[in-house]
Amino acid sequence: PFFYALRREAHFTDERYSLHDNTQLYLSFDFNKSPSTLVIGMIYQKEIAIIDLIICDENSVQGKSPLEACCFKFKEKYLSSGLITRPYLIVTGDASGTAGGSDKVKNENFYTKIESILGIGKSQRKIRKKNIEHILSQEICNSLIYNCNFKIYKSAELVLFDMEQAQIENGKLVKGDRDKGKGLDITDAVRYFMDCV
């Protein structure tokens, strides 16, 4: 398994998470045409936790791309409700999201779009210049799971299922058919979160 240190009985909790004062939330994105995946992680004292998951496709919010829909759903649930304030957000994710494309406006990318929708600054972005190799990511993730008070809360139970399915072969994460829910987009977003902590 990719996450060989992960143990359901030790790392999954049925409890509801609570956001304490000064809790930082990490928003970890995996960008795909569809769906876009947002894993929400929390760091508080010695606890590193995954507290929520938002997955959106082109039908999630009318007139919005999957990425925009993820951002709007997060904004509604966490910012508009007052659960957290903008200064405590850190955005991370797939390093390819900093690249432009043929349909992109100059100096715009996935991260500038996220920052614009959430009303946060570039200084709250924590992105590697390029994604690290899967084999190194595996060691970082398992070291964190083993050595920290790592939890996955019930509100993010799908994260646990995806992590349990993740396999590595010849130094690469084995990905299945995205249409059958085996694209491991959630696992990728989890890796980006753990790699930046």
Regions picked out by a protein language model, each given a short descriptive name:
Residues 176-197:
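Acidic, Mg2+-coordinating catalytic module of metal-dependent nucleases/exonucleases
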Residues 48-179:
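Mg2+-dependent endonuclease catalytic cores in nucleic-acid-processing enzymes, primarily RNase H-like
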Residues 1-29, 34:
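ATPase catalytic-site recognition across NTP-hydrolyzing enzymes
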Residues 44-46:
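Solvent-exposed strand-loop boundary residues in beta-sheet-rich modules
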